[in-house]
A protein has these predicted regions:
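Short glycine/proline- and aromatic-enriched beta-strand/turn motifs that initiate or cap beta-hairpins
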Residues: 37-88, 272-276
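Predominantly the C-terminal beta-signal and adjacent terminal strand-loop region
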Residues: 40, 56-60, 65, 212, ...
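Short loop/turn motifs that connect adjacent beta-strands in outer-membrane beta-barrel proteins
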Residues: 38-41, 82-101, 154-166, 225-229, ...
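Transmembrane beta-strands of outer-membrane beta-barrel pores
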Residues: 49-55, 108-114, 152-154, 173-179, ...
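Residues on the lipid-exposed face of transmembrane beta-strands in outer-membrane beta-barrel proteins
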Residues: 47-51, 75-81, 87, 146-150, ...
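Extracellular/periplasm-exposed beta-strand and loop segments of Gram-negative cell-envelope proteins
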Residues: 60-66, 113-143, 178-212, 244-266
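Bacterial Sec-dependent N-terminal signal peptides
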Residues: 1-42, 47-48, 275
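Residue-level detector of the transmembrane beta-barrel scaffold of outer-membrane proteins
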Residues: 44-46, 103-105, 168-170, 230-232, ...
Length: 276
C-alpha cells in the first residue's frame, strides 16, 4: 500500500506541474497573438542543446572540482518575435530603433544535473567527510518564460547578409518547476540522522520539489547560415528565487556560508528557422 501511495503522490505532482506548464504556455501564446494583432511581426522558431554548471549547496564555492563535477545537460525550444519584418505583407516594418535592434524570445526548456559534494570538507577522512561524500542529489528543472534580446547591430542588415554575425544581450524572467532527489548511499539513507551532515539537520534537505521564479541574463551571437536560418551560441546565467532547487538548504541564520540561492550557468548552441 505504501508503494501505491507514493506512486500516486508522484503522479499527482507530475499532473499538477503539467497543468501549470500548459497554463503558462497558453498565456505566452495569448501574449504573442495579441502583439501580432497590434504591431505585426514575423516569427522564428528554434531549438538548442548544451551544458549546465549548477551552483548550489552541494560542494564548495569557487572550487574547481565542484564547478567541473556538478554539471549536466539542458535542452530547449524557442520562439522569437522579429519586429523588423511583417509576415502578413512580406515587407519591412517602419524603421525604428526598437524594430531594428530588439526581439522578444519565448522559451520552454529543461535541464538536469546530478549533484555531489566535492572539495576540502568532503575529502576529509572523517565521519563528516563520509556523510558528505555519501550525499547525492539531482536537480531537474523545467522552465517557461520570456526575455528581451538586444542586438547592437542592425537586424535588417544581418537578415540580408549570409555569413554575417549578430551579437546580442538578453534579459528576462522564467517560471521554473523543479524536481529534486536528495539521498544518501549510507545504510538507512537520510532517514537515519547519523548519516546526515550536522549542518543539514534537522530540516535542511528535501526531495519534495516545487516551483519558483528565476531571472535570466545572457550574452551570445547569431550566425546567418542561409536566408531563412541561423545558428546561435549563448552563455546564460540563471538565478532562482529559491534555495531548494537542489534539495539542500542550510539555515542561513546559523550558517553564514549559505549566502545565495541556487543558480546555474548555461552554454548552448542552437538552430533557428524563419517561418515567414
Amino acid at each position: 500500500m505504501q508503494f501505491v501511495f507514493i506512486y500516486l503522490s508522484d503522479n499527482g505532482k507530475i499532473l499538477a506541474m503539467t497543468k501549470k506548464i500548459k497554463y503558462l504556455l497558453m498565456l505566452l501564446l495569448g501574449a504573442n497573438l495579441s502583439m501580432t494583432a497590434q504591431f505585426g511581426f514575423s516569427h522564428e522558431v528554434g531549438a538548442f542543446v548544451g551544458g549546465v554548471a549548477f551552483q548550489s549547496d552541494f560542494g564548495v564555492r569557487h572550487d574547481f572540482k565542484t564547478n567541473a563535477g556538478n554539471t549536466g545537460i539542458g535542452v530547449g525550444l524557442v520562439h522569437y518575435m522579429n519586429f523588423a519584418y511583417r509576415a502578413e505583407c512580406n515587407c519591412y516594418t517602419p524603421e525604428t530603433y526598437f524594430n531594428d535592434h530588439f526581439k522578444v524570445r519565448s522559451e520552454l526548456s529543461y535541464n538536469s544535473t546530478k549533484l555531489e559534494h566535492f572539495g576540502e570538507f568532503a575529502d576529509k577522512q572523517t565521519l563528516a567527510g563520509a556523510q558528505l561524500r555519501a550525499m547525492k542529489g539531482e536537480a531537474k528543472v523545467t522552465d517557461v518564460g520570456m526575455q528581451l534580446e538586444y542586438f547592437p547591430l542592425s537586424i535588417r542588415e544581418f537578415t540580408a547578409t549570409d555569413g554575417a554575425w549578430a551579437p546580442f544581450l538578453g534579459l528576462g524572467a522564467h517560471y521554473s518547476f523543479f524536481d529534486n532527489n536528495t539521498y544518501s548511499t549510507l545504510p538507512g539513507g537520510l532517514g537515519n540522522p547519523n548519516n546526515v551532515y550536522p549542518r543539514y539537520l534537522p530540516d535542511g534537505f528535501s526531495s519534495e520539489g516545487g516551483s519558483t521564479w528565476s531571472v535570466v541574463s545572457s550574452v551570445g551571437t547569431r550566425y546567418k547560415l542561409t536566408e531563412l536560418s541561423d545558428l546561435f551560441f549563448e552563455l546564460r546565467w540563471q538565478y532562482y528565487f529559491s534555495d531548494w532547487v537542489d534539495g539542500l538548504n542550510k539555515n542561513p541564520d546559523l550558517w553564514k556560508e549559505n549566502k545565495a540561492n541556487d543558480w546555474n550557468l548555461w552554454f548552448h548552441f542552437g538552430y533557428i528557422y524563419y517561418l515567414d
